[in-house]
């Protein structure tokens, strides 16, 4: 993907008095009392908004929240106003809608250095259909466009792709820029040796990533529930562990590809097995070659952790996507925690560590090590698609640098 123009290239002359449509990813979790339980995404969007305000722009902020079917009060962005205002040190104005006369009035009345938060863009089905008329209405209140929502960059929606046809310049925000620099940079031009750790329960959801990474990495470490499909493909007994029967041939061919490309492929040599899928299950450590009948593997074992650690110690770049085990259960979190701790240590030694979205991010945050990594990706699906080498519509739509 070609390099995209960044918001940092716009100065006061470009921004003062201009209305800037900023698509952020403010899709934060809310509890039943509509309180924000994790404001990471809001905080991540602040640098771009502050930069625009300092240059005298008027910011029109748009986001989705959840997956509403039509107007759904519990998916309103209203609960975000107080936290946004607090972080920006000004009073954010809330619009009752994201298009229409009322929004036009509020946008027209916005002073330089003011912020208007539009209501959830997904209250309209036209958003996800990328309807050009809807995109035109969204764009009509602004002069230019900044996309800082990496988490939805893999979707061609009205607020991520459609609006760029009506607003120029259309540029990447700082968060989007950082994601692209790290994820595209890591894949296109990594410091070697380059390792990828891929976990998660299903091979099927990670096939594209594994195939794409096999062409680029020196070491590939596999963990999580997907390993049992690989074991079974190699003729091992896996007890009651999760297996995707229709992916056995694929697992065999991935092992062959790794061999032919000279990639060191590491599968766990021992696993923590349980008698049931529960936090309080009976558990024991067994070699991968001796998983007993009626037991299921829920984490990688201590020998595997040691082998993985030795391999990772040789690296200069590491990408991690997907947990090593069922880390939601304390008993089966050791493998995932060990990887998180080791990557934090490696970062301190100058290794580039990239946590590629999804559950690995949750695992790193649970371990309190988020600020110890080089880069934590905010995109789940978007990170995966980028690592798979797929073009992202929300990025393609932005101006070339």
Swiss-Prot record:
Keywords: ATP-binding, Cytoplasm, Glycolysis, Kinase, Magnesium, Metal-binding, Nucleotide-binding, Transferase. One of its GO terms (biological process) is glycolytic process. It is found in: Cytoplasm. ATP binds at residues 206, 225, 297, 328, 359-360. Its EC number is 2.7.2.3. Its cofactor is Mg(2+). (2R)-3-phosphoglycerate binds at residues 24-25, 27, 41, 63-64, 66-67, 122, 154-155. CDP binds at residues 200, 224, 322, 327. ADP binds at residues 200, 224, 327. It is an enzyme of class 2 (transferase). InterPro entries: Phosphoglycerate_kinase, Phosphoglycerate_kinase_CS, Phosphoglycerate_kinase_N, Phosphoglycerate_kinase_sf. Belongs to the phosphoglycerate kinase family. HAMAP family: Phosphoglyc_kinase. This is Phosphoglycerate kinase, cytosolic. It comes from Triticum aestivum.
